[in-house]
């Protein structure tokens, strides 16, 4: 234990001397503390051969606090009046430069472009100025503002519709390009359209005549067939009636034949 106390006194004495040196002379740099024997107690006490546990923990805590707070003992260096005067002059120069910087910022072209008011705000300001000069009623002011807003909305809707039409046409063309392997068909000329129309008319007339001629030729044939069927039916009916009439008549030859047989 005496050995450890002697080591702590040595380390404590060195730190106190360093503190006194820093307080007296602020211009000198602080020498770095020597840490040759700082790891000795930890290594010896970790083996568990010397001292009690309570004393060991207290010594370790004291050493840690002394090593962690070296800046608390340092004093803030005092400024001379000459240095204070120089600082004041520099601050006044910086404060005088601020308005010039603001003027330069206000003269920037991009700043003007970005901070320019919108068309709606301009119209609203103009309408407010006109209303204040003329001294009209509030209803007229409201109508003017509403008309301006509606006009702007119509313009925006028209632009959107144009853009949508353009997008649709582009998508349609792209689909045609991908679907048609041979690409786009050539645009038909006026002669081709006229020739096609004439050919279509001729074909229609030919088909119409053929259909109606077939119908007209079939009509008399059907009539004849129906008449023949009717005449045949009448003949058959007449023959059947004649046969019935002939069977009901009495023939003398029959009676004579019967008598002869008896």
UniProtKB/Swiss-Prot annotation:
Protein name: Protein NEGATIVE GRAVITROPIC RESPONSE OF ROOTS
Disruption phenotype annotation: Roots exhibit a negative gravitropic response, and grow upward in the opposite direrction of root gravitropism.
Organism: Medicago truncatula (Barrel medic)
Function: Involved in the control of root gravitropism.
Assigned keywords, A-Z: Growth regulation
Keyword Protein biosynthesis in annotation: no
GO biological process terms, semicolon-separated: positive gravitropism; regulation of growth
Family: Belongs to the LAZY family.
């Amino acid at each position: 234990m005496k050995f450890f106390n002697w080591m702590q006194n040595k380390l404590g004495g060195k730190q106190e001397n360093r503190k006194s040196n820093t307080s007296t002379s602020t211009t000198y740099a602080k020498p770095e503390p020597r840490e040759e024997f700082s790891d000795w107690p930890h290594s010896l006490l970790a083996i568990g051969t010397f001292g009690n546990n309570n004393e060991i923990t207290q010594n370790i805590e004291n050493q840690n606090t002394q090593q962690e707070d070296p800046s608390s003992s340092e004093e803030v260096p005092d400024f001379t009046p000459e240095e204070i005067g120089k600082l004041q002059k520099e601050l006044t120069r910086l404060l005088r430069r601020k308005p010039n910087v603001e003027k330069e910022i206000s003269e920037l072209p991009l700043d003007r472009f970005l901070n320019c008011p919108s068309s709606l705000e301009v119209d609203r300001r103009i309408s407010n100025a006109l209303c204040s000069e003329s001294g009209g009623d509030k209803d007229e002011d409201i109508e003017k503002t509403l008309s301006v807003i509606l006009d702007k909305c119509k313009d925006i809707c028209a632009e959107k519709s144009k853009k949508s039409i353009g997008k649709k046409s582009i998508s349609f063309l792209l689909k045609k390009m991908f679907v048609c392997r041979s690409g786009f068909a050539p645009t038909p000329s006026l002669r081709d359209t006229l020739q096609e129309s004439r050919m279509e008319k001729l074909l229609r007339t030919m088909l119409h005549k053929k259909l109606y001629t077939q119908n007209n030729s079939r009509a008399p044939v059907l009539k004849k067939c129906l008449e023949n069927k009717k005449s045949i039916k009448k003949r058959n009916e007449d023959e059947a009636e004649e046969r019935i009439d002939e069977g009901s008549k009495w023939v003398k030859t029959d009676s004579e034949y019967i008598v002869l047989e008896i």
